[in-house]
Regions:
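Helical "substrate-binding/catalytic lid" subdomain
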Residues: 1-120
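Hydrophobic alpha-helical segments
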Residues: 120-130
Length: 130
């Protein structure tokens, strides 16, 4: 049960970080974005805690990035053992690994937004070279 719940948590928080990054990159008011999420069907205790952390770039640890990455690896190993595909988990695991490479191991797992930002910078550099 714990692995299934953590699969959802890890994937959801990576997606939430990406959504905040997308909203910010598109010039949206992030407080309006937070309000839209928290006043609709997507609202949860988790969004009410993590969106303000993302907006404020508060990476004080509640759940460490290193623990999130370890969790994704344990889940992936079990999924492979039982023959279950986990494409969302695999993508979020890659992002948490990239976040670790940015020295975010003891930062909150929402610091994964920095890995997403790094991908944006890399994509921009490739586009600029063309």
């Amino acid at each position: 049960m714990k692995l299934a719940v953590n699969l959802y948590l890890n994937s959801m928080l990576a997606a939430l970080a990406e959504a905040v990054h997308f909203a910010d990159g598109g010039g949206l008011d992030l407080e309006a974005f937070r309000h839209a999420i928290d006043s609709g069907q997507l609202a949860s205790d988790l969004t009410r805690v993590k969106i303000p952390k993302l907006i404020g770039r508060d990476f004080a640890v509640q759940a460490a990035t290193s623990d999130a990455y370890t969790s994704t690896r344990l889940i992936a190993d079990e999924a492979r053992a039982v023959g279950v595909a986990t494409p969302m988990l695999d993508l979020s695991s890659e992002l948490y690994r990239e976040s670790l490479a940015l020295a975010n191991d003891r930062e909150d797992m929402v610091a994964v937004i920095e890995a997403i930002e790094a991908r944006t910078r890399s994509a921009s550099e490739v586009t600029a070279v063309r």
